[in-house]
Amino acid sequence: MPTISQLVKKGREKVEKKTKSPALQSCPQKRGVCVRVYTTTPKKPNSALRKVAKVRLTNGVEVIAYIPGEGHNLQEHSIVLVRGGRVKDLPGVRYHIVRGTLDCAGVNNRRQSRSKYGTKRPK
């Protein structure tokens, strides 16, 4: 426990919060170009082929972003919008691609949670 005079001399040190998505540089989303689109396998108790893309953002940083939903139309040189948000069972994947914006189409035949997958209202 510091004395009052010690606090007057030094003061308390602020604890700085570390960001979970540093490549976005405090922006809500960033645009980028797909460098490579591929599948990868999740960590131990789970088993699947998760769709991910390596994206070069407009600030020059390359990140791995998850492609949510069933099926996608992304390939190399596609322009995508990247938001924060990690995938728990994929190490190193700390970003999501926003469906239904730029070159990334929405999910087909999606009835529920449509806004998260960029799908228009069915007739």
Curated annotation (Swiss-Prot):
Keyword field: Methylation, Ribonucleoprotein, Ribosomal protein, RNA-binding, rRNA-binding, tRNA-binding
PROSITE patterns linked: RIBOSOMAL_S12
The protein's role, per its UniProt record: With S4 and S5 plays an important role in translational accuracy.
Name of the protein in question: Small ribosomal subunit protein uS12
Region (Disordered): 1-23
Source organism, top-level taxon: Bacteria
A GO CC annotation given for this chain: ribosome
Organism: Thermodesulfovibrio yellowstonii (strain ATCC 51303 / DSM 11347 / YP87)
Membership in a protein family: Belongs to the universal ribosomal protein uS12 family.
Subunit structure: Part of the 30S ribosomal subunit. Contacts proteins S8 and S17. May interact with IF1 in the 30S initiation complex.
GO biological process: translation
Pfam families attached to this UniProt entry: Ribosom_S12_S23
3-methylthioaspartic acid PTM sites in chain numbering: D89
One Gene Ontology MF term: rRNA binding
InterPro entries reported in the protein's UniProt record: NA-bd_OB-fold (IPR012340), Ribosomal_uS12 (IPR006032), Ribosomal_uS12_bac (IPR005679)
